[in-house]
């Protein structure tokens, strides 16, 4: 009679041998997988660090920009104020003058007015004196209409000058306008 059944001891040894071979074959694959995993984890850590650096740099740029805007608002009038200081000096000198010479006072006031006008012009503040111009409701405020020889809707007199800054009206000129005939 033939024994078709294998020896359990032999079978176990064969199984153990094939398991060892499988384990030996799996060992390089596992090492390669572990190396790939370690490499991927290192890359993830590097990318996370780069992201955090970029995020911090972006925040620093935003903060610096806010500081620059804040300083610009805070000191925007500095140049204009520097141009006004000579006017202030002239007015203080006039107040302290005790000579009583009215001609001298008038000359001082005229000089101070020129200084102020120059300071305003340096600050891009320009006077509107529209006598003879067509009435413009964006730059002029009509106080009254008067009979005149000029064309209708033309500025006849300026009661108070208007002012613009960089083409924007600060104050409209108060004017009288020629009425239609």
From Swiss-Prot:
GO molecular function, one term: adenyl-nucleotide exchange factor activity
Sorted UniProt keywords: Chaperone, Cytoplasm, Stress response
Taxonomic superkingdom: Bacteria
Localisation per UniProt entry: Cytoplasm
Bias type Polar residues, positions: 1-13
Entry keyword annotation includes Chaperone: yes
Family indicated by similarity: Belongs to the GrpE family.
Subunit record text: Homodimer.
Protein name, entry field: Protein GrpE
